[in-house]
């Protein structure tokens, strides 16, 4: 879909349905009223995690081809949660190219459900586009700090893409339950539930009253926010740098233990199972995705505890450089649009998003994967494009 952005004001792009309007005529209004916005389809390991926001208490299930996924937890189908999540095999959804959301309103849940009025099931069909084998376009954005309108407009200005990366600091802090849904809102707005999304947590998502509940609203692998992604010609390792200062910093009030969390990820990178995955991935486009551009901090030393923080970033970098040999590290955090190279870096580091708090201009980046190379261009929500850089496979 092409947008003549210079001739259309930003708010016009944000009509109901956002960037993608469903064309299915068979969808009933009752079904639409149950589903808030569009689904978000996150790539995790070899699966997709489909997140839905439901306005009323309801039973929800996903159907892909002949396979049905109920989203049960230990045999119980949830009905009271606003957010419902389902894991479906990646190869299955890629092949079928279509999934059905089936909702059944359930206003009351009793020990014996025959006493409760039963509502009919209503369905909503979504097309899904798997990544192409070549010429993959990836739109990347981070550090929007609640500027949902501008971020959605930046995605529109970027034009057509095949995969979305939401790379942290999407909020200022987790102040309310709605803050937890920000990634789901953005993913739905920008893809309409039709494209895969990779999502990371930024340091600002660790802050606030509701920060501890984030895994209920965000893609994860067995509760962990670090994992690998196998999606078409792309292989990625998603890492989480946690907070950007030492655990003992007075701003955190002893509420975090990112030191242990980073060491846990180091052990993950050192695991023999993951190293075997790295060998298999050598024919793919290889990315490392992390909100904090960790290679640029390794080797720095200030206070003893912060020195340990920067040391573990160096260990991460060493493991990745030795065994994965990634083509690009994709990050945000610094609110700058640049690509940094370093002799000890595992790969060039893209800092591919920016927020100018004086003007509220939000910028992202477009990565094009083609013919063994990655091309990077920058764009803001006003449609202004910046020069990019081409990175060849090592």
Q: For each predicted feature, which ranges?
A:
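Active-site neighborhood of phospho(di)ester-bond hydrolases with catalytic His/Asp-centered motifs
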Residues: 140-143, 164-169, 196-203, 288-291, ...
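Extended active-site neighborhood of metal-dependent phosphoesterases/phosphodiesterases
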Residues: 102-124, 181-279, 315-316, 325-326, ...
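Active-site-proximal segments of metal-dependent phosphoesterases and phosphodiesterases across multiple
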Residues: 279-327
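Bacterial N-terminal signal peptides
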Residues: 11-19
């Amino acid at each position: 879909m092409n947008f003549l952005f210079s001739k259309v004001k930003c708010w016009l792009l944000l009509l109901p349905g956002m960037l993608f309007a469903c064309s299915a005529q068979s969808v009933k209004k009752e079904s639409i009223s149950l589903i808030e916005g569009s689904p978000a389809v996150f790539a995790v390991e070899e699966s997709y995690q489909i997140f839905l926001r439901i306005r009323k208490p309801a039973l929800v299930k996903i159907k892909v081809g002949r396979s049905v996924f109920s989203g049960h937890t230990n045999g119980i189908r949830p009905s009271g949660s606003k957010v419902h999540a389902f894991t479906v095999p990646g190869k299955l959804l890629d092949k079928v190219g279509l999934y059905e959301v089936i909702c059944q309103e359930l206003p009351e849940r009793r020990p014996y459900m025959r006493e409760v009025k039963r509502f009919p099931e209503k369905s909503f069909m979504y097309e899904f586009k798997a990544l192409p084998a070549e010429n993959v376009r990836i739109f990347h954005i981070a550090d929007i700090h609640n500027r949902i309108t501008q971020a959605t407009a930046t995605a529109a200005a970027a034009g057509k893409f095949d995969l979305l990366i939401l790379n942290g600091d999407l909020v200022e802090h987790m102040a309310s339950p709605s803050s937890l849904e920000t990634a789901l809102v953005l993913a739905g707005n920008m893809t309409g539930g039709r494209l895969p999304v990779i999502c990371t947590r930024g340091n600002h998502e660790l802050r606030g009253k509701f920060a501890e509940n984030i895994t209920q609203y965000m893609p994860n692998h067995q509760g962990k926010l670090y994992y690998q992604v196998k999606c078409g010609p792309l292989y990625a390792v998603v890492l989480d740098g946690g907070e950007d200062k030492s655990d003992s910093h007075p701003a955190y009030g002893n509420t975090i233990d990112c030191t242990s969390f980073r060491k846990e990820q180091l052990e993950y990178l050192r695991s023999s199972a993951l190293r075997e995955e790295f060998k298999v991935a050598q024919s793919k486009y290889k990315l490392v995705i992390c909100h904090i551009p960790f290679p640029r901090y390794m080797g720095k030393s200030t206070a003893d505890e912060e020195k340990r923080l920067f040391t573990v970033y160096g260990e991460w970098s060493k493991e990745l450089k030795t065994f994965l040999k990634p083509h690009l590290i994709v990050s945000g955090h610094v609110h700058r649009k640049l690509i940094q190279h370093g002799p000890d870096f595992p790969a060039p580091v893209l800092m591919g998003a920016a927020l100018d708090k004086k003007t509220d201009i939000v910028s992202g980046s477009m990565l094009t994967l083609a013919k063994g190379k990655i091309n990077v261009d920058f764009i803001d929500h006003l449609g202004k494009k910046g020069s990019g850089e081409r990175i060849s496979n090592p």
